[in-house]
């Protein structure tokens, strides 16, 4: 499945390079118009990241997200700075279909386990942003990639699988925003090891060949941000590479 994405800071569409707020590109685009265009080209899911909220949970862009959801028919998944059950409930009540949880899954796993039980497997997606070290270990970063988490991807899957983990978004941080291609080896490995989880691939997508490579890795979906914003290809072309999306 092709999942177009936009990242938002202070209501503006942006892209970061490798998660670095100091390396920000701002696009002169209306978030709603951009998402509506993706929807018109056939996207059935859209991914929104609240980067303001990821950096400062007190400044989450909830009102804007509500306006976007209200004016879109596609399913929306939202991440960025979600730290409490009240925030999860607020987003779901706005009509967001799936809430993406990152740092908290590392820092307070019991809390996130309870959300999987309360809201169901389809309402919660874990965002596992990994740095792969020289030993090949997949270390999950936290707090908008501003600090390392110290836990491995495998240990986190083991923590959440008994509670019904079904959706997980995995980004190789070294590829994010780089347009250097996706780490398909990473996705092949985790899909083979955990076939019951619907893995979303993210980071580095630049070409339609990259899209096809991720599809062939066995991932369930692919998050595409920058490549669409800079018109490397269209949503329609990406969907043509990934039938049954």
UniProtKB/Swiss-Prot annotation:
It comes from the Bacteria. The keyword Cytoplasm applies. GO terms for molecular function: 1-(5-phosphoribosyl)-5-[(5-phosphoribosylamino)methylideneamino]imidazole-4-carboxamide isomerase activity. It is found in: Cytoplasm. One of its GO terms (cellular component) is cytoplasm. Keywords: Amino-acid biosynthesis, Cytoplasm, Histidine biosynthesis, Isomerase. Gene3D superfamilies: Aldolase class I. SUPFAM superfamilies: Ribulose-phoshate binding barrel. GO terms for biological process: L-histidine biosynthetic process; L-tryptophan biosynthetic process. It catalyses: 1-(5-phospho-beta-D-ribosyl)-5-[(5-phospho-beta-D-ribosylamino)methylideneamino]imidazole-4-carboxamide = 5-[(5-phospho-1-deoxy-D-ribulos-1-ylimino)methylamino]-1-(5-phospho-beta-D-ribosyl)imidazole-4-carboxamide. Pathway: Amino-acid biosynthesis; L-histidine biosynthesis; L-histidine from 5-phospho-alpha-D-ribose 1-diphosphate: step 4/9. Its main location: cytoplasm. Transmembrane segments: none annotated. HAMAP family: HisA. PANTHER family: 1-(5-PHOSPHORIBOSYL)-5-[(5-PHOSPHORIBOSYLAMINO)METHYLIDENEAMINO] IMIDAZOLE-4-CARBOXAMIDE ISOMERASE. This is 1-(5-phosphoribosyl)-5-[(5-phosphoribosylamino)methylideneamino] imidazole-4-carboxamide isomerase. The gene is hisA.
């Amino acid at each position: 499945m092709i999942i177009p994405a936009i990242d938002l800071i202070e209501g503006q569409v942006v892209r970061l390079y490798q998660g670095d707020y100091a390396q920000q590109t701002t696009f002169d685009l209306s978030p709603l118009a951009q998402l509506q265009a993706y929807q018109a080209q056939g996207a059935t899911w859209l991914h929104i990241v609240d980067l303001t909220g990821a950096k400062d949970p007190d400044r989450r862009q909830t009102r804007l997200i509500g306006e976007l959801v209200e004016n879109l028919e596609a399913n929306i998944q939202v991440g960025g700075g979600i730290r409490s059950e009240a925030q999860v409930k607020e987003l779901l009540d706005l009509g967001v279909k799936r809430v993406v949880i990152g740092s908290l899954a590392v820092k307070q796993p019991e809390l996130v386990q309870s959300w999987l039980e309360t809201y169901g497997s389809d309402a919660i997606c874990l965002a596992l942003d990994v740095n792969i070290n020289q030993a090949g270990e997949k270390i999950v970063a936290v707090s908008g990639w501003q600090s390392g988490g110290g836990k491995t991807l495998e240990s986190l899957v083991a923590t959440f699988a008994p509670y019904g983990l079904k959706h997980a978004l995995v980004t190789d941080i070294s590829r994010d925003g780089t347009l250097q291609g996706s780490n398909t080896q990473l996705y092949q490995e985790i899909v083979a090891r955990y076939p019951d989880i619907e893995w979303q691939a993210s980071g580095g997508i630049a070409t339609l060949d990259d899209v096809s490579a991720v599809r062939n890795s066995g991932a369930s979906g692919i998050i595409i941000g920058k490549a669409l914003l800079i018109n490397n290809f269209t949503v329609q072309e990406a969907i043509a590479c990934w039938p049954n999306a």
